[in-house]
């Protein structure tokens, strides 16, 4: 139950979410749906599908210790430290502290995530988890799948501002049973703010390279509904030739509160991007350009009683993409419109025998354009081709608690019309052993599958060529986790192993070839270690202030593969061998809060190792007015995440915000 703005919980809440404020806490949830736990600092937790409505965090207010937390989610509720998944939660408070200007930049501070940026400030980046590709993760907005079925390059083209976010939850590792076949190596769920407590928020930003931005969000309660509207525009002239951009966002949300703590959530959104894409997809063409639009609409319910909960969902999103291989010309130009329609239902039943969950989803995808699909009988303008597919999935899962053990097992059955007559079963088993209050040990095994994207199946241009008879990719994954947690210290160590077959990649069979071809790699194995440590320092080092904390995160990974005939790989064989992140937060006097963020990464096969240092200063002018200063890449390091696409050097920006 929430007892203060600082979110101290002392007993179970019967709502469909459990929010809590802590530092690198480990939350215990046996099964997951769409993960939702609010914490004041990055936390490693297990979570389930949740949507929260907490007020904005006060950066100057210390976090409170949580006692006896139980999180009630859409599938099951379990006490603290009995997690069967490893989930990193980035809270609203940490989002406000970090020197990030986009979700992609924010995710760069998590060691287990590889953010290969093409354009800065959230223009475009390939985000992957534990050596997987950017096509192998699912992106969700309030539990609704917003991943691009066309290409993972576009999966973050949806309407969201950092100030809209309550928390971001990163599930590391396969999660097909929870999110479907797209969650091959993990999932990222963005939970937005629903509370109308902050009725007005406005922010203006300016900086180097003619950076300009404006945000406006309003919220109000009307009858039984909570409503909010968020608008924004960001632009820059670019940090080098042909890297200019404009980004527009609009997001409307309504929550209808029904009797017995039932609710319905509606969200409508629009995103538009126009940007120079200097060497984004090929160094041979530095003057590329792209214009994308995304519209989303969804309705989600949380209904039922104490024993039986129902979560119906219906959604639609529309992607528009215009790409020019040479800006301002028709050479290599392509136009596409993609529609994704989906409907699903989760039924969750709790009894003395445990918790049983039955789920089902129907998803239809269609594309019309001049590159993807097969020729239309009646072509129109650019839209000469059409393609479609339908996916049906059913899942069954049961979770039981036996003394200090939490055991969960289930399977997902999937059928896609591109694989006529074939049914794929993806089982998963998780075990959590919690011998002592401060310790827990977890082991999981699962099977996963991913279908080719629309680009994988059909895309061809002068430097890319789709392969014939492309097949789904499969993997078996295992993970072992050890976690230790007190009120001031949290640590975790995990080992992961993924053995994949038929992995999809864009490759060359001879280095002299001009085009990459989409192709199934025979075998690929990723394995590695992740370690994290978080310390709350304010009480022990008072000079750091209430904000004092230190967090360290490290990833080490190796890869073995068998890819007969492959001379060059564009994605699958280019992975992070090492990634280390460190964050130190502290107060400067009574009104200023500072956060230093260090990142080091060493990538195999493409870019050279590098390190960057960022700083964010937040100055509380009044209770309603704040000023911020962001210094990104203070050392002016010259680096690239993708060979041939250099990233910005030192970039200074400032902002002022008002909230009511």
Where are these regions (language model features)?
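Short strand-turn segments of transmembrane beta-barrel domains in outer membranes
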Residues: 175, 186-187, 192-220, 230-231, ...
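Short acidic/polar hinge/loop motifs at secondary-structure boundaries
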Residues: 126, 145-172, 191-193, 252
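Conserved C-terminal beta-signal and adjacent last beta-strands/turns
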Residues: 28-33, 255-259, 432, 443-444, ...
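Outer-membrane beta-barrel signature, preferentially recognizing the C-terminal barrel domain
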Residues: 281-305, 389, 420, 434, ...
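Extracytoplasmic beta-strand/coil segments of soluble accessory domains associated
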Residues: 104, 108-144
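Flexible loop and strand-edge segments within Gram-negative outer membrane beta-barrel domains
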Residues: 236-243, 247, 261-340, 464
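Gram-negative outer-membrane beta-barrel transporters
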Residues: 401, 405-407, 496-499, 519-603
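N-terminal periplasmic "start-of-domain" segments of outer-membrane beta-barrel proteins
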Residues: 65-96, 126
């Amino acid at each position: 139950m929430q007892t203060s703005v600082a979110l101290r919980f002392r007993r179970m809440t019967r709502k469909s979410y459990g929010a809590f404020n802590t530092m690198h806490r480990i939350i215990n949830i046996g099964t997951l749906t769409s993960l939702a736990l609010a914490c004041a600092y990055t936390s490693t937790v297990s979570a389930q599908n949740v949507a929260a409505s907490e007020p904005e965090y006060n950066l100057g207010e210390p976090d409170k210790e949580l006692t006896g937390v139980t999180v009630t989610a859409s599938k099951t509720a379990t006490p603290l430290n009995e997690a069967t998944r490893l989930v990193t939660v980035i809270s609203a408070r940490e989002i406000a502290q970090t020197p990030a200007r986009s979700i992609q930049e924010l995710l760069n501070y998590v060691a287990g995530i590889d953010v290969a940026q093409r354009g800065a400030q959230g223009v475009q980046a390939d985000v992957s988890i534990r050596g997987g590709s950017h096509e192998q993760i699912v992106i969700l907005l309030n539990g609704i799948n917003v991943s691009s079925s066309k290409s993972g390059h576009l999966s973050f083209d949806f309407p969201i501002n950092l100030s809209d976010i309550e928390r971001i939850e990163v599930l590391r590792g396969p999660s097909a049973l929870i999110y479907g076949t797209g969650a091959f190596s993990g999932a990222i769920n963005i939970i937005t703010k629903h509370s109308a407590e902050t009725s007005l928020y406005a922010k203006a930003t300016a900086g180097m390279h003619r950076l300009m931005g404006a945000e406006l969000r309003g919220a109000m309660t009307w009858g039984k509904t909570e409503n909010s509207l968020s608008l924004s525009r960001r632009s820059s002239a670019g940090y080098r030739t042909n890297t200019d951009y404009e980004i527009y966002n609009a997001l409307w949300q309504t929550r209808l509160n029904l009797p017995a703590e039932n609710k319905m959530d509606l969200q409508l959104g629009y995103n538009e991007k126009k940007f120079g894409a200097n060497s984004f997809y090929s160094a041979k063409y530095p003057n590329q350009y792209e214009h994308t639009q995304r519209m989303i609409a969804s309705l989600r319910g949380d209904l039922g009683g104490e024993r039986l909960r129902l979560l119906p969902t219906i959604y639609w999103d529309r992607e528009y993409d215009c790409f020019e291989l040479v800006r301002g010309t028709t050479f290599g130009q392509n136009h596409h419109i993609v529609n994704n329609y989906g409907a699903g239902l989760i039924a969750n039943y709790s009894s003395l025998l445990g918790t049983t969950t039955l789920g089902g989803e129907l998803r239809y995808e269609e594309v019309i354009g001049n590159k993807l699909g097969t020729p239309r009988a009646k072509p129109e303008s650019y839209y000469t081709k059409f393609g479609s597919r339908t996916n049906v999935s059913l899942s069954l899962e049961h979770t039981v608690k036996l003394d200090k053990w939490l055991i969960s097992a289930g399977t997902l059955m999937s059928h896609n019309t591109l694989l006529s007559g074939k049914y794929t079963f993806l089982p998963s088993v998780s075990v959590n052993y919690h011998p002592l209050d401060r310790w827990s040990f977890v082991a999981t095994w699962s099977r996963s599958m991913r279908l080719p994207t629309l680009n994988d199946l059909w895309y061809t241009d002068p430097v890319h060529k789709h392969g014939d008879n492309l097949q789904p990719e499969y993997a078996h994954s295992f993970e072992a986790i050890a976690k230790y947690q007190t009120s001031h210290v949290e640590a975790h160590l995990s080992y992961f192993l993924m053995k994949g077959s038929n992995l999809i990649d864009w490759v060359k069979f001879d280095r002299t070839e001009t085009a990459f071809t989409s192709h199934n790699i025979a075998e690929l194995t990723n394995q590695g270690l992740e370690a994290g440590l978080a310390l709350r320092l304010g009480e022990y080092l008072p000079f750091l202030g209430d904000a004092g904390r230190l967090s360290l995160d490290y990833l080490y990974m190796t890869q073995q593969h068998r890819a007969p005939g492959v001379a060059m790989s564009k994605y699958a064989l280019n992975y992070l061998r090492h990634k280390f992140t460190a964050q130190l937060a502290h107060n400067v006097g009574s009104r200023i809060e500072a956060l230093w963020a260090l990142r080091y990464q060493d990538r195999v096969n493409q870019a050279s190792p590098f390190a960057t240092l960022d700083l964010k200063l937040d100055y509380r002018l009044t209770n309603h007015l704040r000023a911020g200063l962001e210094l990104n890449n203070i050392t002016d390091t010259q680096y690239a995440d993708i060979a041939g696409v250099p990233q910005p050097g030192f970039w200074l920006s400032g902002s002022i915000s008002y909230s009511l």
